[in-house]
Every structure is written in C-alpha cells, then in structure tokens.
Amino acid sequence: MSDTRAVVVDPEAPGRLVIRAVPGPVPDRGEAVVRVRALSLNRGEVRRSGMAAAGWRPGWDLAGEVERAAADGSGPRTGARVVGMLPEGAWAERLAVPTHALAELPDTVTLSQAATFPVAGLTALLALGKRGPLLGRRVLVTGATGGVGDFAVQLARLAGAHVTASARRADQAPALRTLGAHEVVVGDAIPPSPKYDLVVESVGGRTLGTALGALARGGMCVTLGVSASAEVTFDAREFFIAGRTTLYGFYLFTELGSEPASVGLRRLADLVAAGQLTPHVSLERPWTEIARVAQDLMARRFPGKAVLTL
C-alpha cells in the first residue's frame, strides 16, 4: 500500500514532533482502514513523546471515515463516519484500526467532537462505573477542567450524583458549575468534609493524599493520572478508619481488556447525539501545528481538549 503521513518523534525538531511519510496501513482481517479527519491530544502521549526515541509514533484518539471495511465483515461499513483509538500511532492520515476499537457515529455528532471521546471520554465513563450506580451518591472530580474531568463532571451529574469539582483557580468555578458541578473546591488540597462515595482523581500529589482522607465508608478513590506529582503522602489512619475504603489504580488500556472500546465509544456518541453530553473543544487547529499545540497543552494554556484536523 502507498505511503501515508504521520506524526513522529524527532528529538532535533522544535517540540520533538514532526509530520513525515511512513508506510501505509496493511490491515489484518479484523481491521478497517480509516482515513483520519480529526485527532485529539492527551497529556500522557505528549509527555511520552518528550522522552521517546526518534521515530516513535504517538497518538491515541482518532475520528474519520472508513476507507476500507474489515475483510472479516466485522465493524463499520466502507464510508461510515467513525471514532476510534489505538495504543499508539493514531496521529496519521490513514490507519488500520481493529474493529473492536471503532464505533460508527450518529449523523449529528461531528468528527471534531468525536475525536475527544476515546481516552478522555472512555476514562471518565469507565472510572465512574467502578463504584456502581451513582444515583444519590457524592462524587468528587479532581482536575475537573481537564479533558477527563470535563467528561466526568457531566457524566456523574447525568447519573444522578451530587458532584463536587476540584479546580486550581477560583475563576474556573463558573464554567464547572455550568458543566453540572453542584459545588467547586479550589486549590490543591481536598477538605476532609464532606465525605465522598467516589473520587475520580487525576492530579496526584497533595490532591490525591487529601482526597483519600475525604472518603466515606465504603468509598472508592479511582486514581488515573499524576498531572501535578507522582509522589503522594497521606494519612493512612484517615483512609482506613472510614471503613471499607478502596484505592483503585486505573489504566484505560488495561480496563479495555474487559470490554471493547467500541461499546463505550458508541454510548458516548449516543449521549452527545441526544444532547445529554457536550464535548468541549477549547482549541481546534490544523495538524501541521501539532508541535505548538502539544507544548501549549503541557503548559496548561487552555482547558479541556485540543483537536487537530487533517
């Protein structure tokens, strides 16, 4: 198959990310060839690209059209608009994607919206599900202005939870309340009261340490990121004295071993189509600006998600 273009790591280039010609996709029987039209960035893949060797291809999130359906007859048809994900290498013009990692999109969901679903949306959806039904429960979402946090606040409110959002600055509170947060906590420390049935925690450091002391009896803290610090000190007595508390380590690609990505992606797409969930694209640029947008993401120059179009 003819060459395509993809984002690759070049340690000598500004921002370490460049677009170069690479071999075109050669799909297995259970893979569809997708023409990518939009992609989104996540801190994890950008952070790794800053350390990866030359030639590594980053990228998790993608949206586009099926150029060639899977040979085994599974998955979306040729011409279908889809959202999908890969464990790496998704930032490319054309890709072979396993059909279990693809979901067809309703007509009213744009490709830019869909590109935000895979890592941020699925992480929020699956993390919230770890505690069981949330109706009437107290849920705390830390890092709430980020991509995962944005989805988590909305999905928790939709599930009937009483939602508290944690933010770094007071001026972020109005936007979080608009998303659906009932209350907003400002700063890197979580007060010991009220107590929470579920904490979705993506910050690490002091935020994680104090969140563990704010769990209700039987409460669970799902830790899924360390945007502030990977080192945590916490009061073990505060954590265990509540009784039956749990600290759950969440890694999306491990969780997807239990349920294919296509299931959650379709659920997110249906919620957006129904007007119950709103993806927030803070920045939309051509993919030729990948290096600059990646740097802006890591410097926290915008909230929510950045989408690049091809």
What does each model-identified segment do?
Residues 191-199:
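A short acidic, Gly/Pro-enriched loop at the edge of an enzyme's catalytic core
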Residues 166-170, 187, 202, 225, ...:
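N-terminal Rossmann-fold cofactor-binding loop
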Residues 206-277, 310:
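Glycine-rich phosphate-binding loop and adjacent beta-alpha segment
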Residues 23-40, 48-89:
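Glycine-rich beta-strand-centered segment in the early N-terminal region that forms part
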Residues 115-186:
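Mid-domain Rossmann-like dinucleotide-binding core that forms the NAD(H)/NADP(H) cofactor-binding site
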